[in-house]
């Protein structure tokens, strides 16, 4: 219903409404959409809660209506934000309403800002549709590219993409996407009040954006994605001297989550701040891969060449976005003895020695050869750490019950645990050593059993004796039996050696939540 109301607003006058989104802030269905997105955004089914409170209050339509009424009144929002800042500073116990207002305004405004991005996903009737182009948007399509390219390269730059310290830089970048001036002023006001609260609490600018990203996740990701898009647009070789896969969509928001490129050649980079042309170097074996805040720049060149790339990136962020990128965020590593964590896998280039028997006339001789192979394995220890943070086990990997799910029905509990297991098996189908997933499945299986036992006030042994040991058998379903849109349900793979087969699916458009949780924890 809310989606239809929003669609009706945009269809009244498409060109006018797209550039004037401010009235949507006063529409109740916008906050309903924000609340629904929070409930369905994760495989953990965790509702989005008000910071500092132990229960979900966002579903209250009465509070939303009161918030809209106060925003209509002159200066009421300013007073509400000031009260919120003061209450947080002094630890006031009655700051629920101002706390609620701040987070709901952030969530609702994030939905509104997503509209210009989502409209880009809607093809016009005049555009020519390319069939099956969705297959090129799969995250797994990156790995065949890496298998084909990285095994021939020498060095890799492991990059943590920096972000501006001051939020105003993010707003300035967002102006390229949104032409609605009142909405931008509203965003500046919201960020200004947040900055004032940080000053009261003596929070440094470096920690300020970290606090903002935790309390206003959705709005932060919109600002962050617009910044990354701008950075890659200004990065001249990505725009003019390369090809890349188009970005994927996550629900209604065009989120540039990943793409990869092969740089054919790079001759010069023009830089306004340098007042001159930087003559660069050709490198026909340079490859760039990014997912969210982490990127990889791989080269076949020498150590000196890859070191020049590192210096260039540091200067690029400094002069284009007015902030210093710390050099330790960019690591130079040789592929021969380095493994990197990317997209939920630990990847490396293995050297496999082999001997080939040759015959020349009557003489036989052996020729030793070395081949390089791109290898991907499941990061068991990081996954256990991710399960621990999600309260499925201890930090040592001992399964525990999930108290927040104990109030659900038995079928819902098993469905949620089973869904996580199936997603893990599906996402890590490209691992060369799938046996390591058995430990993760065991943790989830026993955590599910303990959650059911907690609900029925029993022990795990008594529960399994009463319901049968086959109750949780789906947790050990082989990856080859996981239903996928790419392969028919009747497709069977031989079990012998199946744990060594790597399968990359073309229907995965987002990273597994456990791996994603680890990347940003």
UniProtKB/Swiss-Prot annotation:
Subcellular location: Plastid, Chloroplast
Entry's Gene Ontology cellular component terms: chloroplast
Keywords, ordered alphabetically: Chloroplast, mRNA processing, Plastid, RNA-binding, tRNA processing
Chief subcellular location: plastid
Pfam family, one: MatK_N
GO MF annotation terms: RNA binding
Domain of life according to the entry: Eukaryota
One GO-annotated biological process of the protein: mRNA processing
Disulfide bonds: none
Function: Usually encoded in the trnK tRNA gene intron. Probably assists in splicing its own and other chloroplast group II introns.
Protein name listed in UniProt: Maturase K
Provenance organism: Trillium catesbaei
Gene name as annotated: matK
């Amino acid at each position: 219903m809310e989606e239809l109301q929003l669609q009706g607003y945009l269809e009244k006058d498409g060109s006018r409404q797209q550039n004037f989104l401010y009235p949507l802030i006063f529409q109740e269905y916008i906050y309903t959409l924000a609340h629904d997105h929070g409930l369905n955004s994760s495989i953990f089914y965790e509702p989005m809660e008000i910071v500092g409170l132990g229960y979900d209050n966002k579903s209250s339509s009465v509070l939303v209506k009161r918030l809209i009424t106060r925003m209509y009144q002159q200066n009421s929002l300013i007073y509400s934000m000031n009260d919120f800042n003061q209450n947080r500073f002094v630890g006031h116990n009655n700051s629920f309403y101002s706390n609620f207002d701040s987070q709901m305004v952030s969530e609702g405004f994030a939905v509104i800002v997503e509209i210009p991005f989502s409209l880009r996903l809607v093809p016009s009737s005049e555009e020519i549709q390319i069939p099956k182009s969705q297959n090129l948007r799969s995250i797994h399509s990156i790995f065949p590219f890496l298998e084909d390219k990285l095994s021939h390269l020498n060095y890799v730059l492991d990059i943590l993409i920096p972000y501006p310290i001051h939020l105003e830089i993010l707003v300035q970048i967002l102006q390229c996407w949104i032409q609605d001036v009142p909405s931008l002023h509203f965003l500046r006001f919201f960020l200004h009040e947040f900055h004032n609260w940080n000053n009261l609490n003596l929070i440094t600018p470096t920690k300020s954006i970290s606090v903002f990203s935790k309390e206003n996740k959705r709005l932060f990701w919109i600002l962050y994605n617009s910044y990354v898009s701008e950075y890659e647009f200004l990065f001249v070789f990505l725009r003019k001297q390369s090809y890349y896969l188009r970005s994927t969509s996550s629900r209604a928001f065009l989120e540039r989550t990943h793409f990869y490129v092969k740089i054919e050649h790079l001759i010069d980079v023009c830089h306004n701040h340098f007042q001159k042309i930087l003559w660069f170097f050709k490198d026909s074996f340079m490859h760039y891969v990014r997912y969210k805040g982490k990127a990889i720049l791989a080269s076949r060149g020498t150590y000196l060449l890859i070191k020049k790339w590192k210096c260039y990136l540091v200067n690029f962020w400094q002069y284009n976005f007015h902030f210093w990128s710390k050099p330790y965020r960019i690591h130079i590593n040789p592929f021969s003895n380095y493994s990197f964590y990317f997209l939920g896998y630990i990847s490396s280039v293995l050297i496999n020695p082999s001997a080939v028997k040759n015959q020349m006339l009557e003489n036989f001789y052996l020729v030793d050869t070395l081949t390089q192979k791109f290898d991907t394995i499941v990061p068991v220890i990081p996954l256990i750490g991710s399960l621990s943070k999600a309260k499925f086990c201890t930090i040592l990997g001992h399964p525990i019950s999930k108290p927040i799910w104990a109030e659900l029905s038995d079928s819902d509990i098993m469905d949620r645990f089973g869904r996580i297991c199936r997603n893990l098996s599906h996402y890590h189908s490209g691992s060369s050593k799938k046996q390591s997933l058995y430990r993760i499945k065991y943790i989830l299986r026993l955590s599910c059993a303990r959650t059911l036992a907690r609900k029925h006030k029993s022990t795990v042994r008594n529960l399994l004796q009463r319901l049968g040991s086959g109750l949780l058998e789906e947790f050990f379903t082989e990856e080859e039996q996981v239903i996928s849109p790419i392969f028919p349900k009747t497709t069977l793979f031989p079990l012998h050696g199946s744990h060594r087969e790597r399968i990359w699916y073309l229907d995965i458009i987002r990273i597994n939540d456990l791996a994603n949780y680890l990347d940003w924890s």
